[in-house]
């Protein structure tokens, strides 16, 4: 998910 990718 985008949020997971960006927060990574």
Swiss-Prot record:
Keyword tags: Pheromone
GO molecular function, one term: pheromone activity
Lineage, uppermost ranks: Bacteria, Bacillati, Bacillota, Bacilli, Lactobacillales
Function (record text): cPD1 is involved in the conjugative transfer of the bacteriocin plasmid pPD1.
Organism whose genome encodes this protein: Enterococcus faecalis (Streptococcus faecalis)
Protein name: Sex pheromone cPD1
